[in-house]
Each structure stands twice: as C-alpha cells, then as structure tokens.
C-alpha cells in the first residue's frame, strides 16, 4: 500500500517538475536572446553572457530549486559573493532588477 501511495505521489509531481523545467528553459532562452544588457556587479554583459552565468548558478543551486520562482531567486537576482542585485537594461528603458524582469516574463509565459 505504501509503495502505491509513493508511486502516486511521485506521478502527481511529474507534471509540476516538467512545467518548472520548461519555464526555466524559457527564461534562460529569454535572457540569452534579449537585446537587453545584463548588469552584474556593476559590469555590463550581453544576454548570452548573462544566461551562461545564470546557468552556472542554476547548476550549483539545483538541489535547492523546487519552483521557477526559486530558480529566479537563487540563480538570477543577486551575487552570492557580494550581495549586489543584478539588473537588466533594455534599450530606451530604465534599468530594472533582474528578478522583477524575469517574474514579469514568467507571468506572460504562464498566461499563454
């Protein structure tokens, strides 16, 4: 009975895991392909460089990430060494915190 219950619980968790994986993949591609600049520790990077850095942090924090929001919070919002926030600077716009920018895109993605 316990085995069946555990199997059922794990099967129910699969769609959520798949959704999270798809959302994270979308956000990484969004950063990678953007015309916006990724500002980390005061230095300006391309979206591709930003995505590479976020991916490295994602790999490091993978065991602690249970949701896409965890991914954003742990991998894409601030430096773990300096505590400095990451920012996004899009052409013709004011810079915004990367976490807010990514949460906004996540909301759009989920609405599709």
Per-segment meaning from a language model:
Residues 18-57:
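N-terminal secretory signal peptides
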